[in-house]
Amino acid sequence: MDNRRSLAQPSFSNKVIDTNELKNLIVWAFRNYGIARAANMADKLKDLGFHYATQAGISLSLEDLRIPPSKQSLLLGTIEDIKATENKYRRGEITAVERFQKVIDTWNNASESLKQEVIKYFKETDPLNAVSMMAFSGARGNISQVRQLVGMRGLMADPQGQIIDLPISSNFREGLTVTDYFISSYGARKGLVDTALRTADSGYLTRRLVDVSQDVIIREVDCKTNKGIILEDLVDTQKILINLEQALSGRVLAENVFHPETNCLIAHTNQDVSPKLAKEITKAGIKKVLVRSPVTCNSRSSVCQYCYGWNLAHGRLVDLGEAVGIIAAQSIGEPGTQLTMRTFHTGGVFTGELAEQIYAPIDGQLIDLDIESYTDVRTRHGEQALITKKPTQVTIRSKKNQKSIINLSKGTTLLICDGELVSKDQVIAESPRRNRLMTERAQKHVVSDLSGKICFSNLTVEETDNNQYTTRITKTGGLIWVLSGEVYSISDSANVIVHKEDKTKAGTILAQTELINHYAGEVRIHQNTNSSITNIQVITESIVIPGCYIYTDVIHKKESYILETEKKQKFLFKAIPNQKIQDGYTVAELISDTYKTTSGGIIKYLDLNVSKKKTGLDKDAYEILSPGYILWISEETHEINKDSSLILVHNGDVIESGTELVKNIFSKSSGIAEIIEKDGIVREIIIKPGSIYKLSEVYSNNDKSRGFLRPGERLHNNISTDKLVYWEYIENEQMPYILIRPVIVYSIPETKSSLIENLVSQKPSQTKLKLVKRTPFRDGERVKSIEGVHLVTTNLVAEIEHRDDNLISSIEFSAKESGNNYFDLRLSTFETLSIKSIDVNKSEKQQSQTRIIVKNGEYIKPFTVVASTEIIAMSEGTVEEIYSEKNTSRRILIATSSDKKTFNIGKSTVKVSVGDWIRCGDFITENMTSLDSGQIIEISSRSVTLRIARPYLVSNGAILHVDNNALIRRGETLAILVFDRAKTGDIIQGLPRIEEILEARKKTDVLLNPHDILDASFDLYIECGLALYEAARLSFQEIQLLLVKEVQLVYQSQGVNISDKHVEVIVRQMTSKVKIENGEETGYLPGELVELQKIEQTNKAITLRNKINASYRPVLLGITQASLNTESFISAASFQETTKVLTEAAISGKLDWLRGLKENVIIGRLIPAGTGFNMYDNCNGSSLEKKNLTANTNDESTISSVRDDLDDIILDDRTARNYFSNKSVE
């Protein structure tokens, strides 16, 4: 420490201490005077700060928010620019996309200029202003927030990330309008949501990083490698993000560094670079330095001291046993929360600039432009400019002959021409901010602002046919003119009455659609409650069914309609009044209990003919086609589905009605119980009523065990009957018996009964009602029921003879004269003609009107015009075009007086001719300009007539939605412009981008796919004749440097500084494995992932035995995959997919050597880092004199010898080391 103190002479610093200077001051004290004195100084600085802060009493008041006076003039200038852009758009000089981009850039530049004005205003007029002191010192807030307080909020983004082209020109001091407030709310919400999500994402990123690198520990002093990486300035589009001096600090040199001019040795190999030495190296003009790096370190599964370099916390070489992997993970993960959230601390304010502007340093003239270095280009604002093909220079000469040379890089857009005069601080060129800017294809719809006729100008169209439709795409950009006029759409069924060149007045009928009936009948017009007519019915037939009437009654607690005939038979109506009916529809059902049973049972047909399939609209019953009988053997079926232990009766028991079968389930009838059981569960209990006849011996008739017994027939043991019965043979445990069951016979007579005579009208009709008997059950079906069922239903079914889809039949109730509660049943057949809803009371002018020609109740013949819909001209004019195309509806264009404009020119000379297209602002005569765009249609001696039109510029590649000469209505799409749009900042930067790089995602739309680059470079090295190991190592190194640069670009773009070495440690873990293609005699399987060093050692050993080496390819693993494929299965299992990892480890018999921190923490041992790290000898006996403390962790013989002496199955490096130290003591 004394040595260090003598070197550092106190020096006087005369600077304004802001955050950066304060950081430098404390680092200087720490480097030179040690941790205690630096801490003491920091304490004193804090006290000093607080002392003066409290004395000054800095606080914010409304008066401190000073708005720069130049704001108003700046806004007025910007609004003028916007107006000029709008005018260009109206003249058809720029496309909708270019207009949008120009408006956004104009406002963005205004906002930036205002920000500079704010800074300048504060510094010049009020340097001690509280707001500026806080923001510029870094104590609180930043420039972006101050800009919003006293400048303008600027442009905002909507929820989809699209920029709203209406900026917020006010600031918080002036206050926001309602519109401003609403536009602001998008960004504010996004900010809140984003903060919550980013925190979670950042935490997960840190977890993955820690998992992938937790076993990277400094295990030795020097790995003796002679390899390294070249350090140079990190540049992104001409801007140095990390300079060489900053990058060199804390690294160890891989080779001697000599002065390029004097050839003196500046620094030697393996020397660590202090900030002072770094300054010397850069001062000598050296641009590239070879340094040692974690990615080129030869240590197995660790990093050596020299390859890592300084521990940046202490400013000296890293200690042995330092867990640098964890430090690296935290260093990368922790700033993750700051990444994209930076945008949203400012409430979603848009600040992204796509181009860096180059300003003229002096007033003067552009001279000696080398035209060959440039090509013509149209800028994103629609202006003509030049773009550089190679790096070049431009010269500006002032009036005093003073020359100023400006260097332009390749791809810079020059906005001025040769010989053009420029003023100081004028934008003369733009260079792209990032040459790696992500773009996406976007579309913008161009919508017509007026109705009229389409005319193409300088437009080349290419048609491509798809199966369904034709796409028209512009090959060259050009103008679409819309000639103003009134456009009327005509339906396909309408007749156009007017002709081309006809004169029209307001109210002239242009086209007419006639509504015609197909059937004769009586007209019925339906009118809604709101007096609008919706449809007209032509009734072709209406029959009242005689001899019956309808009334309402309550059945089953529900009000229903009842149809009663003269014979007092009642039908329950299933239809509702005015219901449309189809053929086979069941209108009503006879209310009768004739065929109602008391319980379930077995049904058998006797001489009964029924339909084979179920009939009716619902297909729910079989139609009975002829008279006959139904035999009914009743039985009561209880569906139980309970355990057999819960049943209270046994199979074959004779039970009385009311017997409890299962808890709370009782029998309704007496009889013999049959229990149907399956798998210990009682499914059903059947109670069969009847008489029992015991048999003295077992029944020998094997053919039949059940059947019908007719009167006079005898059964076994002389059993006879005087009526039809059903018998069953039942074998009981005690003795067999026969059960005689009663049979009920239901007679089904002929359907043609007296009931139908009145119901069917006498004269032939298209709609009839017929009686149909139906049964829902098949012959022999067992009906499971307790309550009973209707075996046969008698239905009233509609029979409709016509099959015309235009005719509809319906059931109507018409009130009887005798009383309100009784109705006649009417069957009507009618044709419905639907019309657009007509408001009877409406009288104002409209484009189309419908007139009803017939009257309600009138009888009309077929093909009478019932109504006509007319399209009416709204104003006076001339029919100019009647347009019809096969895929579009017909349209009529009427040119009115308001579509033309006449200029009185007096004796002035006309500068235009008939047919010319002119744009707003163009001269018609020497001293008269037109305020409208259009086409000159007439020139007389004293006047010029202009047909008003509107030009729309479309770029090449646009998708056209209209044809030349087509007619278009206002608000319809003319074309879709296809363009490349820069992706929003938070997509190409921030956490998602970092995650994409570190997870090595195989993105298709990204400029660089790291996997492809790795494969390509590996194949290239193999082709060049390099050995497998060298090709893999070099291709890995290429991708490592690329990944490090990519990560650094993202962090630097957000203003976060991270040392390269942290990223290198992570990237080393991602690029350490190779995939076996052919294991040959090594014992490895194809597809297996193995460490590059390990497979190379195996291959060397195999070569010594004259066996075939394994072939492999390098693979890039994302951090998640690298964590799961780590050597330690305990670590991998504790990360993700625990079951899978442990199963695979068990199957392949893996060993865990407990080298990392995580495995040891899980097992509950001391971690092998810090104090737990053992500085033990190499097994080969190399001493500590050289400070080469490499651990030989792979000596199989050592482990096997130790195993004999140890009971513990868990063995790590430390145990082995203790064993060796004990042996050496002996």
Curated annotation (Swiss-Prot):
Q: What is this protein called?
A: DNA-directed RNA polymerase subunit beta''
List cofactor names only: Zn(2+)
The primary location reported for this protein is plastid
Q: Name one GO cellular component term.
A: chloroplast
Q: Which GO terms describe its biological process?
A: DNA-templated transcription
Q: Which InterPro entries match?
A: DNA-dir_RpoC2_beta_pp, DNA-dir_RpoC_beta_prime, RNA_pol_Rpb1_3, RNA_pol_Rpb1_3_sf, RNA_pol_Rpb1_4, RNA_pol_Rpb1_5, Rpb1_funnel_sf
A Pfam family the protein falls into: RNA_pol_Rpb1_4
Q: How does it assemble?
A: In plastids the minimal PEP RNA polymerase catalytic core is composed of four subunits: alpha, beta, beta', and beta''. When a (nuclear-encoded) sigma factor is associated with the core the holoenzyme is formed, which can initiate transcription.
Family label = Belongs to the RNA polymerase beta' chain family. RpoC2 subfamily.
GO molecular function: any one?
Answer: zinc ion binding
The protein's annotated catalytic reaction(s) are: RNA(n) + a ribonucleoside 5'-triphosphate = RNA(n+1) + diphosphate
Q: What is its EC number?
A: 2.7.7.6
Q: What is the lineage of its organism?
A: Eukaryota, Rhodophyta, Bangiophyceae, Bangiales, Bangiaceae
Q: Where are the transmembrane segments?
A: none
Cystine links in this protein are: none
- What Gene3D superfamilies does its record include? 1.10.132.30, 1.10.150.390, 1.10.1790.20, RNA polymerase Rpb1, domain 3 (1.10.274.100)
Q: Where in the cell is it found?
A: Plastid, Chloroplast
The entry marks the following residues as binding Zn(2+), namely: 223, 297, 304, 307
What is the cofactor note? Binds 1 Zn(2+) ion per subunit.
